[in-house]
Amino acid sequence: MYAKVYQYKFPGISEAKVAAAYCSDKLGQKIDEHNFHGLGILISQEGDLTIWIKFDDVAKLKAFNKDADQFVHDLKTSFVFKENKYVGIYVYNY
């Protein structure tokens, strides 16, 4: 199992809520196209937004990366935030 994880820090929870709705819409449209195994979007009270997208194999993750660049670009032109992203392999998942 592979995952693409985005971590964003917004000025406050209000901005994170708006961004979460935007991300839910944009990424939700990509579920069938890229055959996501899972999609999770979390918000903290401090304005953190975490998005994880699970893939069954690395080929699907690499195929999504092409669309991911446009998604991140659109997000950056619409919102102010700090970004941390990485690709990981699930070591343990229940």
Can you say where each PLM-predicted feature lies in the sequence?
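C-terminal structural segments of small proteins and small subunits
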Residues: 71-85
